Amino acid sequence: MQPVGSAPRLAVLVAMVVLASSAACCRAQLASNFYAGKCGNTSVEVVIQVAVKARLVWDKRMVAGLLHLLFHDCFVQGCDASLLLDGPNTEKTAPQNSGIFGYDFIDDIKSELEAACPGVVSCADIIIAATRDAIALCGGPSYAVTLGRRDGMSSVSWMASDLPSPHVDIATAIGMFAKKGFNSFEMATLMGAHTVGVTHCSVIDDRLRNFNGTGKADPSMDPTYAWILTTFACPKGQAFDNIVYLDEPSSILIFDKSYFNQILSGRGVLAVDQALGMDPATAWMVQFFATTDFFPAMFAHSITKLAALEVKTGTAGEIRRNCRLTN
């Protein structure tokens, strides 16, 4: 057993080591000024930022959509916009991706950039830059992105099995992230994106009403919170599969550390959320992020690393004219 206080001290040490090494992570063939001078008088990143700002005015949920889209794209075949491709048996058709939204928004940005400089800006880069802007505009960290990704030319539904499910146990999740080069601390950090996350009642119905066939709510969930969700968000006989926010009501769609406090209160919405705070391998990480101010910097590091996962550069892939179709 660790001495009292050793876990927080270890967390600070881990965070400092990770952040110190982040600048060199995975950026060899990407560049912060990749599109400089390549789109006439148009600034690619300004176009994306303006579009994100305008969308968030009336659709703040888009921050959740973009984060979800980025993670599900990058975790399968790398950050190559393969998730955007239409067609039978593509990643988009996989059950794991049924809740993804924001495709139309990426299309809108792509259309604007194609009008300014055809065949220059990749769909993969649009996802990365738009997500960065949405995070910052919703109160999260501002961080630099490197660009120069190219778009993938294949998309296969079965490869979505690389994605962890909302019900995955922590040991399995750690293994899945490790295969992609992420340690458990980075995994817990990325799960902090659930501070602006959303799900649907159908995903958590078993936790609310029939946990492990007991006919009762998951005992790890705060009983009052379970009652609130079953009474107001997910009542029996609802006509629609309602949206449920993954963070507390006072912090919905605000990018902060409150997600971790929510878990400490037994109010993790997804099974994997609450498991993060209960498994000995990660419980101390939840405590650490909830009680310190390291989360923004660690998240900036971890999502930057994710955004550089298995990227296609140089002559690999292509620059799609339409994000839904290969050229």
Protein language model annotation of sequence segments:
Residues Q2-N327:
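Catalytic cores of secreted/periplasmic or lumenal enzymes
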